[in-house]
Swiss-Prot record:
<dbReference type="GO" id="GO:0000785">
    <property type="term" value="C:chromatin"/>
</dbReference>
<keyword id="KW-0238">DNA-binding</keyword>
<feature type="zinc finger region" description="C2H2-type 3">
    <location>
        <begin position="245"/>
        <end position="269"/>
    </location>
</feature>
<dbReference type="GO" id="GO:0031519">
    <property type="term" value="C:PcG protein complex"/>
</dbReference>
<dbReference type="GO" id="GO:0000978">
    <property type="term" value="F:RNA polymerase II cis-regulatory region sequence-specific DNA binding"/>
</dbReference>
<comment type="function">
    <text>Involved in the reprogramming of X-chromosome inactivation during the acquisition of pluripotency. Required for efficient elongation of TSIX, a non-coding RNA antisense to XIST. Binds DXPas34 enhancer within the TSIX promoter. Involved in ES cell self-renewal.</text>
</comment>
<feature type="compositionally biased region" description="Basic residues">
    <location>
        <begin position="1"/>
        <end position="15"/>
    </location>
</feature>
<dbReference type="GO" id="GO:0008270">
    <property type="term" value="F:zinc ion binding"/>
</dbReference>
<dbReference type="GO" id="GO:0051321">
    <property type="term" value="P:meiotic cell cycle"/>
</dbReference>
<dbReference type="Pfam" id="PF00096">
    <property type="entry name" value="zf-C2H2"/>
</dbReference>
<dbReference type="GO" id="GO:0006357">
    <property type="term" value="P:regulation of transcription by RNA polymerase II"/>
</dbReference>
<dbReference type="GO" id="GO:0008584">
    <property type="term" value="P:male gonad development"/>
</dbReference>
<keyword id="KW-0804">Transcription</keyword>
<keyword id="KW-0832">Ubl conjugation</keyword>
<dbReference type="GO" id="GO:0008585">
    <property type="term" value="P:female gonad development"/>
</dbReference>
<dbReference type="GO" id="GO:0003700">
    <property type="term" value="F:DNA-binding transcription factor activity"/>
</dbReference>
<keyword id="KW-0479">Metal-binding</keyword>
């Protein structure tokens, strides 16, 4: 690059001399030797490449009319170095833009994380206080836990007076209500015409569709038909009296036809009593829900006798 610039400068200098006599020629008439020497003296320029810049130093006696002027040098500088400088500026601006964009994205992520943390903290403190009474009532978790014998909701059961024996007895025979609004949104309707059943997921739907299928498995003893062969085998144990499910606790060995009955029986050995009496002051616990319901009726009869005595 440096050699090319020197060559171009030399060529332009020779053109700038035009028809002037060489340095060894005789001086013209009418001009002194000093004036002529100043006229033909070339521009003293030093060219160098310094990290992308052109450094030049014109001679102290350079003439403004010379072809090899500051204007020419400026053009050379623009032609050789303007574009890379612009590219460097563009790159700097791009980096600044990416930096700002990254900061904005990071700020957005921090904001989202903060929002999620606030939401989780809000849920942890307890949103249930602001829920509608209908949801906190019979459709609440406390109500369902009570119906399974775990605990009584604080404040009692909505719409039921436990001091009234009739309402208490009626409540003892009730089952947990179904949240129809929730089921209508999440359940899958049975596609069979005339069937209004709704299932919670596809696995339950596939199992339910077997009901509408042909009942090819018929009991030879009583003629009852079943969709699945496993159901027929379980039913046939009623006729044979076979009890394949045996209690493995030491000293027991009691046998059952159904695995459900075995699981209920095992609670006797484990001492698990899941169903608790909800009445205040009564801490009775029971293995089966039917025993709890029967026990609740005793409270109803006691309250009735007390009212009659008054």
């Amino acid at each position: 690059m440096s050699q090319q610039l020197k060559k171009r400068a030399k060529t332009r200098h020779q053109k700038g001399l035009g028809g002037r006599a060489p340095s060894g020629a005789k001086p013209r008439q009418g001009k002194s030797s000093q004036d002529l020497q100043a006229e033909i003296e070339p521009v003293s320029a030093v060219w160098a490449l310094c990290d992308g810049y052109v450094c030049y130093e014109p001679g102290p006696q350079a003439l403004g009319g010379d072809d090899f002027s500051d204007c020419y040098i400026e053009c050379v500088i623009r032609g050789e170095f303007s574009q890379p400088i612009l590219e460097e500026d563009s790159l700097f601006e791009s980096l600044e833009y990416l930096k700002k964009g990254s900061e904005q994205q990071l700020s957005q992520k921090v904001f989202e994380a903060s929002s999620l943390e606030c939401s989780l903290e809000y849920m942890k403190k307890g949103v249930k206080k602001e829920l509608p009474q209908k949801i906190v009532g019979e459709n609440s978790l406390e109500y369902s836990e009570y119906m399974t014998g775990k605990k009584l909701p604080p404040g009692g059961i909505p719409g039921i007076d436990l001091s009234d024996p009739k309402q208490l007895a009626e409540f003892a025979r009730k089952k947990p209500p179904i949240n129809k609004e929730y089921d209508s949104l999440s359940a899958i309707a049975c596609p069979q015409s005339g069937c209004t059943r709704k299932l919670r997921n596809r696995a339950a739907l596939r199992k339910h569709l077997l009901i509408h299928g042909p009942r090819d498995h018929v009991c030879a003893e009583c003629g009852k038909a079943f969709v699945e062969s496993s159901k027929l085998k379980r039913h046939f144990l009623v006729h044979t009296g076979e009890k394949p499910f045996r209690c493995t606790f030491e000293g027991c060995g009691k046998r059952f036809s159904l695995d459900f009955n075995l699981r209920t029986h095992v609670r006797i050995h484990t001492g698990e009593k899941r169903f608790v009496c909800p009445f205040q002051g009564c801490n009775r616990r029971f293995i089966q829900s039917n025993n709890l319901k029967a026990h609740i009726l005793t409270h109803a009869n006691t309250n009735k006798n007390e009212q009659e005595g008054k």
